[in-house]
Structures are given as C-alpha cells and as structure tokens.
Amino acid sequence: MKTCVWITVAFVLLLAAPATRADGQDEPYKFFRESVGLNEDQIGTIRSGKALAKVVESTTPDEVFVFGAVYVKASPEKYLELASNIDALRKLPGYIDIQSFSDLPQLSDLDGFALEHQDIEELKTCKVGHCEVQLPAEAIEEVKQSLDWSAPDLDYRVNQLARRMALQALLDYMHGGNTALGVYRDKSHPAAVADTFSSVITRLSALPVYLPELNEYLLEYPKAKSDNVQAGFYWEKVNFGLKPTFRIVQRVVYRGASPADPAYAVAEKQLYASHYFETALDLTVCVQDAQRPGFYIITVKGSKQAGLTGLKGSIVRKVAVDKARSSLERVLLSIKQRLESEPLQGN
C-alpha cells in the first residue's frame, strides 16, 4: 500500500494535469490505479457512479487518512455551492445538527446547541490529565470553578457555559490563528492543536506547490488573504458511529485564478472537537472527466486522534477507521444524488 504522503502528493498533482488536457486523458484513473492502489474492479465501481472509500496507510497509529471518490454528472461549481449550503449539509448522513456562525460570531449563533447528558455527567469528574470530554487545560479549570454541580438546572448551566466558551474560542482563533487553538493536557502527552494540525497538513506535501494560496490560508489565517478564497465558520453535532461529537469548523472554498486551468477545492478545518479528534482536515478537489460530461469528487480526510495506540487503541482504531470509511461512502453517494437531481447544463 502506498504511504499517505505519496497518496496526497499524487492527489494534488491532479490539479496540475486536468483531465481536459491531452496528457490528462487517463486521469483520474491513473491516480486511482498507481497512487491509491485501486484495482480495475474498484475503478470500474467509481466510473459507474458508485461511491468508493478506502483507508490509506498512515505513518503512525494516531493518524487516520481516508480516501474517497465518486463520479457526478454535474458541474464542479454546483459542488462548491453545495459545500457552502448549511441547509443542504444538514441532510447528509451523520449530521445531528449544523449551524453557521455570523460574519461577526455571536452567542445566538449557538442557539440549539446542547451537550449530551453523558458528556455533562463526565464533566463532573473531569480533571487536567484525565477528562472524557476533550478540553484545553484552562477550559477544564473554568468548568470546575464556574458551576454549582448540585444545582437542579445543571444541564442548562453547563450548556450556557459551553456556548460562551465555544464562542470565545472561535473569536480567539479569528484574532490569533492556529496558536490560539490551545493545548490538550488531558492525555499523557500534551497536544498543542497548532502543532498537530501542522503535522497533518504536512502530509499534503504537494499542497504548497500547486495550491499555495490555499496552503498559506490554512496555516497563516488570519494574516493570509486571498481573493480566490471564500471562508466561513459553522458548528456541527455529528455522529461518527461512536459518541455524538460537537465540532467547530472553518470551511474554505477555493477557486483557482486561471479560467483556462481552473482548480476547485474545499477544505474543512476542524478548530475544536469534543471527542476523538485532536485535529482534522478534509480536503476535496473536483477533477473533470476527460471522456464525458461531469467530474469526480475526490476527498482525503486526515485526522490525528487520541486513544488509538497500544493494544486497546488498536482495537478502537479498527472500529473507528471502518466507520470513517463507510461514512465517507454514504456522504459521497448522498452528495452525488443531490447534485444530479438537477439537469447538467454542461461543463
């Protein structure tokens, strides 16, 4: 199996050799075959319009990379529009709730958000070094000191505090970028979110070569600026098959500057997750089919997760990656069905 580094290099190389060129007539099939390691039956599955996902080899057990692809008889612009449509995303498999933040985020943007009762129970015994809910150390102290744990309306109070803390964390990121994302100290090895994100994006080693604006934006926000980027924030409550998880995400939609050689990409950068993910980045590119109208949605989901090492962790990892693979297939198929529900006007 190819390593995740080579997978993502070849993945982004597709953007440098669009299928509209003569030398790109075999793309993305050559990429599927030589880089992802798909056999002809698997490639045929994708060409026939079915979604396919595959777990990609990673360098360490706590890193998880999943590749997925599906052919869609629609235009890439329709996908970019869908990726920015919160109402449409809410209907995709796995979503419990999802809401956009205002351009200037405010507390009311988090109306409707509530922690699971199990999470609230686990917060009662949460302490630095051991906490079932993923929180930076300073947030753990604030939770412990700010609440009357015997109050009859405890769930309400916890959720009000959680909303205020989530809003402040987002505002801090909008001002200070990755360094404001904090450090998780509820593990034996403290994890700085900025460092773990850098380690994941490093695997996308061709990204700074072929999409330098997008790469810089992901690493250097808010200092980085680009006319080719549309960005926004949302929160989501999702079920990955284990515990329901609350996440704050920055969505970055990228359109290449050259009309003759367009590049379409969507990056979803996790800023916070209540469970599992220390950091995560989903990168999707749209590659037009050389032989027929339509395009391929090709996604690589990369994350760094706690609790996946050791004997117990290896068992958890097997379950987690299998659920991630099957979930990606379901989501890609749902996206395809939605995009193809309107007639294709031409690419």
Regions of interest found by a model, annotated:
Residues 23-72, 76-78, 88-89, 93-347:
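Terminal "cap-and-tail" regions of soluble proteins that handle hydrophobic small molecules
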